[in-house]
Amino acid sequence: MYKVVVIIALLGAVRGLDKICLGHHAVANGTIVKTLTNVQEEVTNATETVESTSLNRLCMKGRSYKDLGNCHPIGMLIGTPACDLHLTGTWDTLIERKNAIAYCYPGTTINEGALRQKIMESGGISKTSTGFAYGSSINSAGTTKACMRNGGDSFYAEVKWLVSKDKGQNFPQTTNTYRNTDTAEHLIIWGIHHPSSTQEKNDLYGTQSLSISVGSSTYQNNFVPVVRARPQVNGQSGRIDFHWTLVQPGDNITFSHNGGRIAPSRVSKLVGRGLGIQSEASIDNGCESKCFWRGGSINTKLPFQNLSPRTVGQCPKYVNKKSLMLATGMRNVPEIMQGRGLFGAIAGFIENGWEGMVDGWYGFRHQNAQGTGQAADYKSTQAAIDQITGKLNRLIEKTNTEFESIESEFSEIEHQIGNVINWTKDSITDIWTYQAELLVAMENQHTIDMADSEMLNLYERVRKQLRQNAEEDGKGCFEIYHTCDDSCMESIRNNTYDHSQYREEALLNRLNINSVKLSSGYKDIILWFSFGASCFVLLAAVMGLVFFCLKNGNMQCTICI
């Protein structure tokens, strides 16, 4: 009986060892992120990398902008009446509106999209006269009711409609040459008039067959006006097709024709670089922005956005994803609430995280004769935070490097195979989205691995300090074989623990405890032996009581056969 009491007392001594545990921060509800190895990894903290909101206005503070209003960019070159206030000028931001007017007399511009893009990317337009002169039999001031100006018939301001001076007279063969004496390329635009009927053609240019030829060192083309009836637009059944080319410095361009030509009055020089915005958003001179789209301004520091693939300025890359969460915390292991027994409230990082530790990523919990305590480890926490800080900026840098390479490759493809813009843009978006997902997943994997590594480094630091003075329990804790008060615990935390100071006490306690430790097999035998002995003692006591009662006549036993 005494042996059993001693064993129980010594086992209680084992359980009563001072204890220090290492753990990491945890939260009740973490955030799910994607890593290279797990698409549903829960972390303590994460930040969104995809911007989904914008300001519904154009922030123009600090910008020299030109709002074209009803004027279409093409109208700036040909001189549409709606563009009379925008024929020249400089800007850093050009704003195009949805219902802008490009043409008064109905028509179109060949390769209009490319020309419009050149204008929208420019930082201004200056004009130079072509110096073309015409004979006395040519009227260079043709007008139309479709292009009203100051209440009267007019025409495009930057080109001249050349017609016969006398109605029905054959237009004379005419040749004009423009030489670019500038050091920059000039953009020259001209038109071909397609009459609505033979009568109109004869009245304007005579009965002869019409032909226009245009040539420079880089451009050659011949045009024949097409006479046919067309639906009326602005009261006109005729059409004007505008053509354009770039004249290099020192080059000449020659026009030769006998009617049907809309001649340039001035050539344009696109100067500088600027932003071109297509938007119906109102202008706000009180806010700043570096990125714009049709819905307004995107003011964000995030590397990605899912608002539109068509943005201008210094913008986040478009990805076809609602969300890409970037881990800024460690793997989350919610705390398992345990009973408050002797060690019920203390468990290390191997078992679970600690939700109560809000002042650090890593820390300690201890229990000794003075009670329990908890403290963060600022060194390991700071080491982890230093690697997290700037992660978003590093992601942006990686994004820009990867995406600029992709964009360059696709720009070259566009240049080589022509008008495949929509196809290439869709392909770029798909690749950007894949690259974005991969980059974020890689960063998340690195963050989690790094956080785990810092936890293990801290654990190893404590293990090396304690040496044989403590034993690991397999749950992220150390059971200490000597008395360790609060100052002792503090020395372990701040890495100043003196192993030799407690060596003798720890060794003695270890020997005393180990001498009574039993293997699991012997423990089972003792338990069964104890159970059997208890049953035997109980049975003996009962039988003794029965015999005592029978002897004293207090109990009778009758046996019937």
From Swiss-Prot:
Major glycoprotein, comprises over 80% of the envelope proteins present in virus particle. This is Hemagglutinin. Coiled coil: none annotated. Homotrimer of disulfide-linked HA1-HA2. One of its GO terms (cellular component) is viral envelope. It holds the Pfam family Hemagglutinin. Residues 1-16 form the signal peptide. It comes from Influenza A virus (strain A/Chicken/Germany/n/1949 H10N7). The record marks R340, G341 as: Cleavage. The lineage of its organism: Viruses, Riboviria, Orthornavirae, Negarnaviricota, Polyploviricotina. It is found in: Virion membrane; Host apical cell membrane. GO terms for molecular function: host cell surface receptor binding.
